[in-house]
């Protein structure tokens, strides 16, 4: 359940950035795409950190 919510949030955060990056990539050589990708990756990492406890047990469904 939490993984699917996390995936939906990830899509919501990355899609607007990706679309904006594509329209700006013609003027700055794709630099906007790289920044959008980095920002999305950082946000996804933060979401994953918040979903798992610091000491993850094998029974934890949020830990991969």
From Swiss-Prot:
What does the record say about tissue specificity?
Answer: Expressed by the venom duct.
Species of origin reads: Conus litteratus
In the record, the note on similarity to other proteins reads: Belongs to the conotoxin L superfamily.
Name the UniProt record assigns to this protein: Alpha-conotoxin Lt14.1
One Gene Ontology CC term in the entry: host cell postsynaptic membrane
Q: How is it modified after translation?
A: May contain a 4-hydroxyproline.
- Effect recorded for residue 57 to A: Exhibits higher activity as long-lasting analgesic in the hotplate pain model in mice
Cystine connections: 52-60, 56-63
GO MF annotation list: acetylcholine receptor inhibitor activity; ion channel regulator activity; toxin activity
Name positions with the PTM Cysteine amide.
Answer: 63
Does this entry carry the keyword Nucleotide-binding?
no
Supply the domain comment.
The cysteine framework is XIV (C-C-C-C).
Q: Which residues form the signal peptide?
A: 1-20
Q: Where in the cell is it found?
A: Secreted
């Amino acid at each position: 359940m939490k993984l699917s919510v996390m995936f939906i949030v990830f899509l919501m955060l990355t899609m607007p950035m990706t679309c904006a990056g594509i329209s700006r990539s013609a003027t700055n050589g794709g630099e906007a795409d790289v920044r959008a990708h980095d920002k999305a990756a950082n946000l996804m990492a933060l979401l994953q950190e918040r979903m798992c406890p610091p000491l993850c047990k094998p029974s934890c469904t949020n830990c991969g």
